[in-house]
């Protein structure tokens, strides 16, 4: 399967990444963020929800910080499983995520921001066209959610992040940054 074309942007600081996202958004350009790429790239290969721009966080070093009180969005899952600086439960859960190859590429931020899984949506565009669209990919058009027929008010695809439940149980705070400033989600 061939990857569709897109413009890859590689900011080197968080500020550059935020500025770039703001500029793209202000000009009406759609974009995706990419961390480890273990979810996004397979979706792009299947031509699922492809955007013309992708902003990579790989060079934003401040997002790779790992300490006893801070886990950056770009910290690789395998770093958590081998770390004595994080809660043992986080290490245990990180070690259970997917395969070694996925854990070596996958990031904390990417895991938390995983797209929902849906049998109807996660198919080729041709396959989806053959059975009509679903609420997730055609939101706002009155298309039904294929998981629950005759229901078009919400998508019930399941959220698959591995780390979010354990972070919630441990009372973690998630810090977000964007063009409007910083935001902290206390005890997610």
Question: What residues fall within each predicted segment?
Answer:
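C-terminal structural segment of proteins
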Residues: 1-187
């Amino acid at each position: 399967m061939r990857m569709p074309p897109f413009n890859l942007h590689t900011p080197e600081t968080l500020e550059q990444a935020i500025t770039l996202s703001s500029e793209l958004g202000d000009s009406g350009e759609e974009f995706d963020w990419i961390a480890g790429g273990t979810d996004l790239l397979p979706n792009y290969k299947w031509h699922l929800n492809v955007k013309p721009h992708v902003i990579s966080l790989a060079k934003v070093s401040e997002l790779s910080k790992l300490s006893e009180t801070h886990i950056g969005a770009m910290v690789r899952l395998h770093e958590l499983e081998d770390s004595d600086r994080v809660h043992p439960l986080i290490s245990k859960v990180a070690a259970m995520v997917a395969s070694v190859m996925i854990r070596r590429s996958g990031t904390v931020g990417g895991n938390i921001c995983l797209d929902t899984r849906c049998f109807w949506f996660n198919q080729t565009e041709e396959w989806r066209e053959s059975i009509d669209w679903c609420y997730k990919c055609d939101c706002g058009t009155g298309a039904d959610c294929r998981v629950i027929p005759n229901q078009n008010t919400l998508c019930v695809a399941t959220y698959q992040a591995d780390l979010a439940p354990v972070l919630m149980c441990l009372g973690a705070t998630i810090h977000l940054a964007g063009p409007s400033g910083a935001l902290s989600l206390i005890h997610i």
